[in-house]
């Protein structure tokens, strides 16, 4: 009887074992698992920590007994393979419970070791409570630490899948969270402008972000305080640290056995998952695979590909000619109320190739707008020029966002083009979609671009407009235009365009914009047929504003979060002899009021609070707050250089003060400079 040994369970190894038994009843199959669980839902671990998944047993997909009873497969948990003897086809195994070593022979060996969390040798790492998350015991350790130590603040190092899922689930437990990331964005597999929507969602839910600030060390003080020290030197006080920097392939067994290893440490396999030894196969996070589009080697630590690779190995050992054709990297992650999904190549990756490409953005609803609960989806499609072959897609939005990426992924698997997306037929009913689905819409837009019906410009091209003899027109309503636009734009509403053509210069290149791109498209068709050279801003002002925003500006828009307000006040506070000054400029209502309340909590009796705001609703908010709160005096309320400024102090107002009108102060620039007011 031929013997098959599988090292490692979870996704790839367990799938290979079960599939192999279904195909070959005559094999002796043994699974060796170092940990206490052979097949568990490691993707569910953050949700177990967040108590979304309440019972540990729900994470255990299969047990050794069930494997034996159902598949006649011998699963040995708590057994660590210490070495592979390729010549004699045997493995050395340590039984971790009784510390005995045994040797097992094989005819075929399948490696499914997975990947291990990256833990850099940070200075001071042994002085602070640091955790990684790979398995159920790791999760239990984190949960016990939170409960036993009444954790109030956690710092997550890294903003990838695990970092984001941990941030959400720690917030669900009432823990304040800060993500520290060395790059200028979270989710590095996405392009920056799409990641900005994630930044916004994180900030809105009270997760603080510290981007472009790599961690250099940790330390602890003699009072039990723990600190993360990033390159900026701005220490972060915290109660616990989660390392979510990424993973590296666990390859030490393969290396020691002399198997071929790739430049990034992955085990090299062929399209049938064979290693450099024909009797040894490998699957999962530890292997090097081919990118389906570029045919270049890569590593993709995702559960879906690992399961499929396990099936391929089983087929091959069973005598079938199955082949793994490459990976598209389709993925999805939940970030609070946002679904984030992607497939294929990002623009960042494409810039490293010689492929000629174009991109478009759309913002359709996830289902019919007249049906309650419709939510927008921002969808980016990247495609080859001039063929229209789909190269990648990224989307953020409400429910059903991942469905659109799944459809596009399917089209990509069959080398589909943007013209195929125009014609693709999808199910429709008002609760689930639209007659023109988001997938169709992005196909229409991309096809219009390739056919020359809608030349486009991009959010990052704005600085090139002047040099291109450009004339920028915002075709939204005057009200929308006043709220915000791109610098230098003139406002001609699309409904008035036909009557105001004389205002559009024919000797210039016309650049159009609207909120999401549709109205500007309609305007472009009018102008193009009148002989103008026109381009439309794909994705519209909505994308432009989000893509260009700094983290501080995004935080300002999301200023209702208590955690964001605390950090904002800390950074914007200035102490003078008489005042605590806080500049809450840029925070949207109720952000300035929250900043005021937070500042009053720590205001010394000897000082007054002076707070600046730009939100027009602040005046009414601060007046109402002072009127309802007897322990606070509103001393003055006025304007300084276009900003509202309120002065307050703690203490009960006298009847005379209550009856007296609030004094409105107006000051000149000269007076402000003399008094040394904060920079405005």
Predicted regions and their residues:
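Beta1-alpha1 glycine-rich phosphate/pyrophosphate-binding loop at the start
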Residues: 2-78, 118, 167-190, 330, ...
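Mid-to-C-terminal Rossmann-like scaffold of FAD/NAD(P)H-dependent oxidoreductases
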Residues: 2-3, 8, 286-399, 430-434, ...
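N-terminal Rossmann-fold NAD(P) dinucleotide-binding loop
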Residues: 13, 163-164, 520
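A Rossmann-like FAD-binding core segment of flavoenzymes
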Residues: 26-28, 70, 76-97, 104, ...
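Rossmann-like dinucleotide-binding cores of NAD(P)H-dependent redox enzymes
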Residues: 60, 153-155, 161-219, 301-306, ...
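Glycine-rich dinucleotide-binding loop and its adjacent helix/turn
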Residues: 111-173, 208-209, 269-271, 490-494, ...
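FAD-site-proximal beta/loop scaffold in flavoenzymes
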Residues: 126-150, 227-229, 234-312, 407, ...
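Rhodanese-like catalytic fold shared by cysteine-dependent sulfurtransferases
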Residues: 419-430, 434-460, 465-471, 478-509, ...
């Amino acid at each position: 009887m031929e013997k098959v040994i599988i090292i490692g369970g979870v996704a790839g190894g367990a799938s290979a074992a079960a599939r192999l038994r279904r195909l070959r009843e005559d094999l002796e199959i043994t699974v060796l698992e170092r940990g206490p669980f052979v097949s568990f839902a490691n993707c569910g671990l953050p949700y177990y920590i967040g108590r979304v998944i309440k019972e540990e047993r729900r994470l255990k997909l299969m047990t050794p007994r069930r494997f034996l009873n159902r598949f006649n497969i011998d699963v040995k948990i708590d057994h660590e393979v210490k070495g592979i003897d390729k010549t004699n086809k045997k493995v050395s195994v340590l039984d971790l419970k009784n510390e005995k070593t045994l040797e097992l022979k094989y005819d075929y060996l399948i490696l499914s070791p997975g990947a291990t969390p990256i833990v850099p040798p940070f200075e001071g790492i042994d002085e602070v409570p640091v955790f990684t998350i790979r398995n159920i015991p790791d999760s239990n350790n984190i949960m016990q630490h939170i409960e036993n130590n009444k954790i109030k603040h956690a710092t997550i190092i890294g903003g990838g899948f695990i970092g984001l899922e941990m941030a959400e689930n720690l917030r669900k437990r009432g823990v304040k969270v800060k993500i520290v990331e060395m790059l200028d964005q979270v989710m590095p597999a996405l392009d920056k402008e799409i990641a900005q929507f994630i930044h916004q969602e994180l900030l809105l839910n009270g997760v603080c972000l510290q981007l472009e600030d790599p961690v250099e060390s940790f330390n602890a003080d003699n009072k039990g305080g723990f600190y993360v020290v990033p390159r900026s030197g701005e220490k972060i006080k915290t109660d616990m640290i989660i390392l979510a920097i990424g993973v590296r392939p666990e390859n030490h067994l393969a290396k020691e056995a002399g198997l071929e290893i790739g430049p990034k440490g992955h085990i090299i396999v062929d399209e049938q998952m064979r290693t450099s030894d024909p009797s040894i196969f490998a699957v999962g996070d530890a292997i090097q695979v081919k990118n389906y589009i570029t045919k270049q080697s890569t590593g993709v630590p995702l559960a879906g590909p690992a399961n499929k690779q396990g099936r391929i190995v089983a087929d091959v050992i069973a005598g079938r000619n199955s082949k793994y054709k490459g990976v598209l990297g389709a993925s999805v992650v939940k970030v609070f109320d946002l679904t984030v999904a992607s497939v294929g190549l990002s623009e960042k990756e494409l810039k490293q190739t010689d492929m000629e490409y174009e991109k478009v953005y759309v913002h359709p609803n996830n289902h019919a707008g007249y049906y309650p609960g419709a939510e927008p989806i921002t969808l980016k499609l990247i495609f080859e020029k001039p063929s229209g072959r789909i190269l990648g897609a990224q989307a953020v939005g409400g429910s059903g966002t991942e469905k659109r990426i799944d459809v596009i992924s399917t089209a990509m698997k069959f080398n589909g083009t943007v013209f195929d997306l125009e014609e693709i037929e999808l199910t429709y009913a008002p609760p689930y979609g639209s007659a023109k689905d988001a997938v169709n819409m992005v196909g229409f837009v991309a096809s219009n671009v390739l056919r020359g019906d809608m030349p486009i410009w991009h959010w990052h091209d704005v600085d090139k407009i002047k040099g291109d003899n450009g004339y920028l027109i915002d075709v939204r309503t005057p009200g929308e235009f006043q709220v915000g636009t791109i610098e230098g734009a003139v406002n001609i509403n699309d409904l008035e365009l036909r009557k105001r053509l004389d205002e559009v210069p024919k000797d210039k290149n016309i650049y159009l914009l609207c909120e999401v791109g549709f109205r500007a498209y309609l305007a472009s068709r009018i102008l193009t047929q009148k002989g103008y050279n026109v381009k439309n801003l794909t994705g519209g002002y909505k994308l432009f504003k989000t893509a260009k925003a700094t983290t501080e500006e995004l935080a300002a828009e999301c200023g209702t979060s208590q955690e964001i307000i605390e950090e904002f006040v800390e950074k914007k506070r200035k102490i003078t002899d008489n005042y605590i000054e806080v500049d809450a400029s840029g925070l949207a209502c109720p952000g300035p009021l929250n900043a005021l309340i937070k500042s009053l909590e720590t205001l010394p009796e000897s000082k007054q609070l002076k707070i600046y705001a730009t939100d027009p609703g602040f005046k009414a908010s601060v007046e109402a707050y002072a009127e309802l709160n007897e322990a606070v005096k509103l001393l003055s309320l006025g304007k300084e250089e276009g900003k509202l400024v309120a002065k307050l102090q703690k203490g009960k107002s006298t009847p005379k003060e209550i009856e007296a009108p609030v004094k409105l102060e107006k000051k000149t620039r000269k007076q402000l400079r003399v008094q040394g007011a904060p920079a405005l």
